[in-house]
């Protein structure tokens, strides 16, 4: 049971540091790593653990996509996209809320930073929602819950950790690997249900609060917004098309021309160049080219370091703890304990969803996926759940829940800041969103809902 004690120590240190002392969570994760080194006496392996944390391709992917999101935000391309969406659906009841769901989910997928995305898109969507009758607490939660949904939508960097967890499980159990494109298709299939869930909840709240459409004076002109922003609407195509092609042709067209190894490594490298191509395209379509000179771009990134650093630090320290826990067998011990309880399929799904929800209150989702991902996949597969679906749900049950579940629900606090909403009212309203997220997670994992790509 020592392994479970180590898990308890990690959770306790992060709780005290983050909740008690109000310090950044990445500091808490690093401190937990240091405390665990002292408790377990594994100082001799510290360089190996650091090497594991720094050698993952996740770091480059995170930096590349967050850098792209900085370019999109600073050059006002995001504003153009939001204006186009508002001009199309703002005239319907609750249109500002639907715009927040769609725009925030897309931008959240690019940035991988829930709080940062809330601040970027919420500065436009939250005031628009409030002006049309959304209560402040509801506007804050729509924005925060939609932004954190980006953690489960490709190309979010959280997906890389989930793919790595599936690869680890597949190698250990003799299962054939799937292409990155195929994995992403399944992730989009899963994400579609959660986007629909949020849209339905917005519709329900609009009925309850009698929300109005946006006034004609506030609505952007369709012709003008399309004239300015039509090029920006091609960004999703540029980002998604390589993965769709990889999923469709990885086993035939690419194999015939590149060979099996060439097709395999092409699939693995898609994530590495998509962000760069999209960033170049973003710079090319900017009307005022003086805003994207090398000097201005360098300044953008310099000012955005504070946005990038915390997320990367959490992932690096999480991988370091994951490497240590792998040596200590912590995840395996947890898996053996849960297996001994002889859960039914529904029982196992409820248990894992509950565990990730509770841990998500203090442990970042990316760290959960790194440390426990392969074990969660194995436990779910043992009760009859497709391991590919289990892996595709990891960013959801870990990454999304950690962002919307208080007290670590940083997105809620960011939304409250913009909406100037009351904490008690925002917290109570947020519980509806957390509950709906939990129920839908169970429904998808149980196979009650069909998932495109499976």
Regions flagged by a language model, labelled:
Residues 1-8, 57-61, 189-193, 326, ...:
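Structural signature of hydrophobic alpha-helical transmembrane segments
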Residues 4-9, 27-30, 59, 63, ...:
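Hydrophobic alpha-helical transmembrane segments
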Residues 1-66, 70-86, 204-217:
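N-terminal alpha-helical transmembrane segments of multi-pass membrane transport
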Residues 94-109, 132-155, 174-186, 192, ...:
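Alpha-helical transmembrane segments of multi-pass membrane proteins
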Residues 2-10, 29, 35, 168-307, ...:
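Long, contiguous bundles of hydrophobic transmembrane helices that form the permeation core
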Residues 41-127, 291-383:
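Membrane-embedded alpha-helical segments and adjacent helix-loop junctions characteristic
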Residues 76-77, 91-94, 127-139, 165-178, ...:
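Juxtamembrane helix-boundary/capping and inter-helix hinge elements in multi-pass membrane proteins
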Residues 188-189, 316, 345-354, 358-371, ...:
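C-terminal transmembrane helix pair
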């Amino acid at each position: 049971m020592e392994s479970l004690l180590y898990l308890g120590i990690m959770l306790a240190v992060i709780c005290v540091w983050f909740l008690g002392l109000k310090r950044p969570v990445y500091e808490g994760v690093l401190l937990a790593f240091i405390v665990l080194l002292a408790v377990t006496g594994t100082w001799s392996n510290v360089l190996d653990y650091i090497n594991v944390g720094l050698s993952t391709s996740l770091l480059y992917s995170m930096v590349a996509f967050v850098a792209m999101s900085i370019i999109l935000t600073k050059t006002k391309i995001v504003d153009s996209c939001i204006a186009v969406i508002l001009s199309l659906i703002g005239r319907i009841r609750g249109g500002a809320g639907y715009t927040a769901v769609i725009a925030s989910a897309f931008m959240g997928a690019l940035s991988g930073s829930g709080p940062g995305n809330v601040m970027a898109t919420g500065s436009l969507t939250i005031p628009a929602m409030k002006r049309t009758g959304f209560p402040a607490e509801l506007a804050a939660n729509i924005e925060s819950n939609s932004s954190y949904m980006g953690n489960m939508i490709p190309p979010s960097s959280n997906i890389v950790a989930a793919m790595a967890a599936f690869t680890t499980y597949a190698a250990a159990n003799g299962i054939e690997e799937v292409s990155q494109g195929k994995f992403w298709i399944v992730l989009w299939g899963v994400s579609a249900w959660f986007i629909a869930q949020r849209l339905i909840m917005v519709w329900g709240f609009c009925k309850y609060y009698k929300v109005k459409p946006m006034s004609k004076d506030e609505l952007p002109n369709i012709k003008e917004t399309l004239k300015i922003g039509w090029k920006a609407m091609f960004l999703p195509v540029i980002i998604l098309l390589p993965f769709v092609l990889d999923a469709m042709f990885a086993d035939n067209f690419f194999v015939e021309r590149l060979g099996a190894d060439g097709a395999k490594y092409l699939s693995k490298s898609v994530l590495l160049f998509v962000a760069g191509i999209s960033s170049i395209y973003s710079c090319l379509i900017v009307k005022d080219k003086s805003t994207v000179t090398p000097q201005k771009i360098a300044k953008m990134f310099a000012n955005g370091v504070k946005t990038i650093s915390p997320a990367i630090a959490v992932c690096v320290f999480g991988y370091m703890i994951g490497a240590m826990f792998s040596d200590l067998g912590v995840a395996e011990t947890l898996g053996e304990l849960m297996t001994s309880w002889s859960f039914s399929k529904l029982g196992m799904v409820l248990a894992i969803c509950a565990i990730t929800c509770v841990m998500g209150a203090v442990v970042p989702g990316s760290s959960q996926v790194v440390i426990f991902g392969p074990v969660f996949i194995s436990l779910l597969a043992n009760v009859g759940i497709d391991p590919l679906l289990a892996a595709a749900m990891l960013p959801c049950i870990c990454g999304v829940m950690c962002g919307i579940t208080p007290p670590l629900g940083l997105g809620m606090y960011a939304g409250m800041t913009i909406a100037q909403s009351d904490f008690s009212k925002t917290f109570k309203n947020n519980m509806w969103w957390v509950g709906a997220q939990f129920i839908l997670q169970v429904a998808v994992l149980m196979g009650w809902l069909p998932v495109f790509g499976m």
